[in-house]
Regions:
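Intrinsically disordered, low-complexity basic tails and flexible linkers associated
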Residues: 1-96
């Protein structure tokens, strides 16, 4: 099982690319507070401040998030899974 957490610099780079590509209005409305937790076996796991924002990212922006993350992290991202902050993705693989 391959797991990788982004550094702070990589996290800021992902946020900056999202802001650049989507525009400030969309970024502020949807991605404010978005955080990439880790990439595990091609699955990007992230948190958002609200369940609504997490659902919007999953449904409308997962392809863009995957593309940006895999270019920033130099690792394939095949799936994006975003939950509300504090919820668990999978207990066995939850970051400490």
């Amino acid at each position: 099982m391959t797991s990788r957490r982004p550094t702070k610099v990589e996290q800021f780079a992902i946020e900056a690319k999202l802001n650049l590509i989507l525009g400030a209005e969309v970024y502020d409305r949807v991605f404010q507070g978005f955080e990439v937790l880790e990439v595990v076996n091609g699955e990007l796991r992230g948190w958002c401040p609200s369940e609504h924002r997490a659902a919007v990212i999953d449904v409308q922006f997962s392809a863009i998030v995957a593309w940006i993350a895999q270019t920033m992290l130099n690792q394939p991202v095949r799936r994006v899974n975003v939950l509300m902050r504090g919820m668990r993705h999978d207990e066995r693989e939850q970051p400490a």
